[in-house]
Amino acid sequence: MESGPCSRPAEPRHCVSGRAGAGLAFPAFPLSAAGAEPGSRIGTVAAVLPAGGCGERMGVRTPKQFCRVLERPLISYTLQAMERVCWIKDIVVTVTGENMEAMRSIIQRYGHKRISLAEAGATRHRSIFNGLKALAEDQPGCELTRPEVVIIHDAVRPFVEEDILLRVVLAAKEHGAAGAIRPLVSTVVSPSADGHLDHSLDRAKHRASEMPQAFHFDVIYEAYQKCSDFDLEFGTECLQLALKYCHRKAKLVEGTPDLWKVTYKQDLCAAEAMIKEKISQEICVVVNTKDEESVGHLLEEVLRNELNCIKVTSTVLDRTSGDIENFIDQCYSFICVNVVSSESRETRKLLSILEESSLPLLYPVVVVLVHCFDFTVVPLAQKMENLVWIRELAKEAKGRNVLLSGVLLNHSQDEQKLQESLVQSAAIIAALVKERNSALVGQLLVA
């Protein structure tokens, strides 16, 4: 093992959708350093994602690939992960005829690129075979080029990174077939016909087969063409087909823990938690002054100390400088510190900038308005009454996937009280950023 983890249609199926049109660019998470110019080493690469399942094990009416995670279909996250890899030339998704229009709508809404659709088959292997046919240059009406290497990946494994994709592709380039594996979590047992233990497998000697897998295109395409109806109907392992029909022993590549497959309802919750964690790694503190002694910069320092695992940066809300646009590309959490009377205008300015970007389309964006005043000078009830506009503005913003709420910070002349309020504000902000709870939209929270 390397360290580092379908069906013959009765009639030929046609590629029913060409390349997706131009769409919004994705602000991607940083890619792993898997190699500077991998394309020069691996030739042309395409991917096939079978997405024709019905989600039977999940026990829901909506196929799991179309279930929403943070208001976005799960398959969209997987497509985004594949699209970020610039050396994957084409991505073929196989979906059932009844879900074809829904899939086209997802591609259009979220700006996915390099995506083509093919009709899914009745089984996993039949769906994969249809996807391969769309790349084989033997189907009329298709614009796709026959690749040298093809990746097969599940539409419900959204956290695949470029590093593991490159490692399985390079291994497939050398050996003809390769696949990611992971250690077994539970011991596998074989029951007898009467329901008693027959034998168990040594967990240390066996591995779980995962995705992605990669193949010389000619190898896996030939394997599917030779495949028996029984294998097409009941088989699940692509590596086994390459071994059985083309005598290619796959290279096994140790995968990462995030290759798991969304299978059950609780997996949707786990996927949501992982996505929230990823998009909460950076906070941008928007201030209205460059004065390093301002309460905004003091809050930034407290946030940095309290949330040492999160990157905290600051900028002045000034569209002419272009600074805020630089943060828009990489941040999904904005803390606006207002100490002047123009809070509403400044907030609308930020929301306008966000609306012009693609950020809220892809993930929920958190905006926290921090209002600083001395609680002993301005009565709290009076201040909250003056900020009632936040509730209405938050309702508007929520429709655009922006979660807006407010924090009241005691800008006391007493340094100890000010520090206590700064620390409490940081704790509230951390919870709002990490949880992204829409139930708190429009709320004013007192620190």
From Swiss-Prot:
Main location, first listed in the record: cytoplasm
Record site feature (Positions substrate for the nucleophilic attack), residues: 203, 261
Keywords: Cytoplasm, Nucleotidyltransferase, Transferase
Gene Ontology cellular-component annotations: cytosol
Site positions (Transition state stabilizer): 57, 64
Single GO MF annotation: D-ribitol-5-phosphate cytidylyltransferase activity
Listed Pfam families: IspD, ISPD_C
Record Gene3D superfamilies: Spore Coat Polysaccharide Biosynthesis Protein SpsA, Chain A
Enzyme Commission (EC) number: 2.7.7.40
GO-annotated biological processes: axon guidance; isoprenoid biosynthetic process; protein glycosylation; protein O-linked mannosylation
Protein family: Belongs to the IspD/TarI cytidylyltransferase family. IspD subfamily.
The protein's role, per its UniProt record: Cytidylyltransferase required for protein O-linked mannosylation. Catalyzes the formation of CDP-ribitol nucleotide sugar from D-ribitol 5-phosphate. CDP-ribitol is a substrate of FKTN during the biosynthesis of the phosphorylated O-mannosyl trisaccharide (N-acetylgalactosamine-beta-3-N-acetylglucosamine-beta-4-(phosphate-6-)mannose), a carbohydrate structure present in alpha-dystroglycan (DAG1), which is required for binding laminin G-like domain-containing extracellular proteins with high affinity.
Name of the molecule in the record: D-ribitol-5-phosphate cytidylyltransferase
Species in which this protein is naturally found: Rattus norvegicus
